[in-house]
């Protein structure tokens, strides 16, 4: 892990821990959702959910009801498991694991809360030890994205709310565990350019229960080039191709 990634990771986890601790004193929601997922590297490969991703999380998007302050810390956390079908060098079924955490500083103006914060997404592709339909050997992959979410939360009615944000990529790292294939060394690439969007529509059934739908998207440019070795001697260079990720899902939340 490079120094820049360590610094960002430490700051983000510290802010997120403090935010969750403070926010639990006011209110929080448990979330459960199912989603469609598609990751694509054009002309190279694609990973598509088969059948779906399932996610469990905790969030707080509300300001304290009895507070006179227009400022507050809000957050979203989520852990996901996905069953994925790979298409590229043949076909392959595998598992995905995903962790997403975002913390925001919110400012309320009537029915609108503007937000800006820090976000982190960790994604693990568990392909090591697998063999595709054409005999290609699989290897594990880990992706980390550090980003700044900017957007807002608007209460359209007492029951209907929409949240939208633009995600500005600060740093991405892609680790390919090529050592899963005998003779190769692992390779880590940095991703410097990219952006994403995230929209959620939330409908309150009663004071405790809500249903929601969401759509998320990432567009990441080519990474830098890193050097690896084979059999301890032969050098090779590798980069992570430009890629897109799309997610669409529905869920239910409970306020406690």
Residue ranges and their predicted role:
Residues 39-48, 84-95, 129-140, 176-190, ...:
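Extracellular loop and loop/strand-boundary signature of outer-membrane beta-barrel proteins
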Residues 186-256:
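Predominantly the C-terminal beta-signal and adjacent terminal strand-loop region
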Residues 28-34, 56, 73-79, 103, ...:
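Membrane-embedded beta-strand positions of outer-membrane beta-barrel proteins
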Residues 54-63, 101-109, 118-120, 148-154, ...:
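Residues on the lipid-exposed face of transmembrane beta-strands in outer-membrane beta-barrel proteins
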Residues 34-40, 77-85, 109, 118-126, ...:
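Transmembrane beta-strands of outer-membrane beta-barrel pores
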Residues 25, 61-70, 108-112, 157-159, ...:
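Outer-membrane beta-barrel channels and translocator barrels
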Residues 48-56, 71, 81, 93-101, ...:
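Residues that define the transmembrane beta-barrel architecture of outer-membrane proteins
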Residues 25-89, 253-255:
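Short glycine/proline- and aromatic-enriched beta-strand/turn motifs that initiate or cap beta-hairpins
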